[in-house]
């Protein structure tokens, strides 16, 4: 089990890893911990770990990356695990990279005609040298808007701008995290999330769940996601039968079109019968309060059994893909 990592979501990863460790033990698996320090060193039993291509990782049957953000969820670690020739849970290199980049993912979904909120990708260089043009393009999205680093999750670095004066500082804040940002129009309705699991071509989809924020919370921020009592998950979501089927079908389509494998959580905005895709997370949170496991639990799959299934899916994919490796 890999946890920690170099990103700003290091602590979230450790919390997710603690939950996964317990669940794997309950499912009858022995978990071997590898913690990736903030500086990038891989540690096992307190000692720095070295790896050799083609030799696996500590004799593990399967690797479970419980890593969030850059250098973990973006295809980098997945590429290393491919070099080690070891089965691993979750999406491969390409799908991980595509889904981690919010702008690239949205452009892929737009090319497939998937309905989404309005958005604009902005680079730091363009913001610095073409500020007036960027401000005009952002204005088309209306207000309020949400400004996000392009490749972070867990609501890290997100700023809600409610007037024109707040747009510039919001972009400046995003660029303290990375050199690319995404600006998204606000969406009406409720936030609905759906968990997906299985092979790329034939995934299973959970019952959709509705995010209900604690009183006074303006939007689904980091505290709402990870602090006890920050939000309530209502399953099944209180949406129409038509919206429910649209959410589940779009979750399946987003998973398949982006080439995902193993698992994902897909997030939507639902207003009456209008369903808009928000984003897809290839390694969603696995803490006690995280939505991914709760949705499967409400769909009849207990947490330890879920982890066991994910490990089995990873092993099956590795066995299948070995046919094409020469």
Task: Tell me the role of every PLM-derived stretch.
Residues 1-3, 57, 98-190:
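Active-site nucleotide/adenylate-binding loops and adjacent lid/helix of ATP-dependent enzymes
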Residues 1-107, 111, 122-136, 313-326:
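ATP-binding N-terminal substructure of ATP-dependent carboxylate-amine bond-forming enzymes
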Residues 2, 240-326:
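ATP-dependent carboxylate activation and anion-phosphoryl transfer catalytic cores
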Residues 31, 87-88, 116, 145, ...:
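Hydrophobic beta-strand scaffold residues
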Residues 46-48, 79-83, 219-226, 282:
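Short, flexible, mixed-charge acidic loops at enzyme active sites
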Residues 79-88, 163-168, 299:
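A glycine- and small-aliphatic-rich helix-loop capping segment at beta-alpha/alpha-beta transitions
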Residues 162-249, 270, 274-276:
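Phosphate-binding site of ATP-dependent enzymes
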């Amino acid at each position: 089990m890999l946890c920690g990592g170099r990103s700003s979501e290091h602590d979230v990863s450790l919390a997710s890893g603690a939950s996964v460790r317990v669940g794997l033990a309950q499912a009858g698996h022995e978990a071997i911990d590898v913690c990736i320090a903030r500086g990038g060193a891989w540690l096992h039993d307190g000692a720095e770990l070295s790896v050799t291509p083609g030799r696996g990782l500590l004799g593990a049957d399967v690797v479970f990356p419980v890593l969030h953000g850059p250098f973990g969820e973006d295809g980098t670690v997945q590429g290393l695990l491919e070099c080690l020739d070891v089965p691993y849970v979750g999406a491969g290199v390409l799908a991980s990279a595509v889904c981690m980049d919010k702008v690239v993912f949205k452009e892929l979904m737009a090319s497939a005609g998937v309905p989404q909120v309005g958005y604009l990708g902005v680079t730091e260089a363009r913001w610095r040298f073409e500020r007036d043009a960027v401000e005009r393009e952002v204005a088309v999205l209306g207000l309020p808007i949400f400004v996000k680093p392009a490749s972070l999750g867990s609501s890290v670095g997100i700023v809600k701008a409610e007037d024109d004066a707040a747009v510039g500082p919001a972009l400046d804040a995003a660029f303290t995290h990375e050199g690319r940002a995404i600006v998204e129009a606000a969406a009406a309705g409720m936030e609905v999330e759906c968990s997906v699991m299985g092979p790329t071509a034939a995934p299973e989809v959970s019952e959709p769940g509705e995010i209900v924020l604690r009183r006074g919370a303006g939007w689904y921020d980091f505290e709402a996601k990870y602090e006890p009592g920050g939000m309530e998950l209502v399953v099944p979501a209180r949406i129409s039968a038509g919206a429910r089927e649209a959410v589940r079908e779009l979750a399946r389509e987003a998973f398949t079109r982006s080439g995902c494998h193993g698992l994902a959580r897909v997030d939507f905005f639902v207003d009456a019968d209008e369903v808009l895709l928000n984003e897809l997370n290839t390694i969603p949170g696995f803490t006690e309060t995280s939505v991914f496991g709760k949705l499967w639990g409400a769909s009849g799959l207990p947490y330890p059994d879920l982890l066991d299934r994910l490990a089995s899916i990873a092993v099956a994919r590795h066995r299948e893909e070995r046919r094409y490796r020469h």
